[in-house]
């Protein structure tokens, strides 16, 4: 494999990793939740929802 081919493969792997991270559930303690003990959860670019327990 040539050097440029290896670089291209590396870029593809980085892009794949970045997109897989983006679809993960993002959780944080959100002040907009009615219950302070609830956590606001967001899937990728979707809207947040307040849940008592959030899966990391």
Curated annotation (Swiss-Prot):
Transmembrane segments: none annotated. Disulfide bonds join 27-41, 33-50, 40-54. GO terms for molecular function: toxin activity. Expressed by the venom duct. GO terms for cellular component: extracellular region. It is found in: Secreted. Keywords: Disulfide bond, Knottin, Neurotoxin, Secreted, Signal, Toxin. Residues 1-23 form the signal peptide. Its main location: secreted. The cysteine framework is VI/VII (C-C-CC-C-C). The presence of a 'disulfide through disulfide knot' structurally defines this protein as a knottin. Probable neurotoxin. This is Conotoxin Cal6.41a. It comes from Californiconus californicus. The lineage of its organism: Eukaryota, Metazoa, Spiralia, Lophotrochozoa, Mollusca.
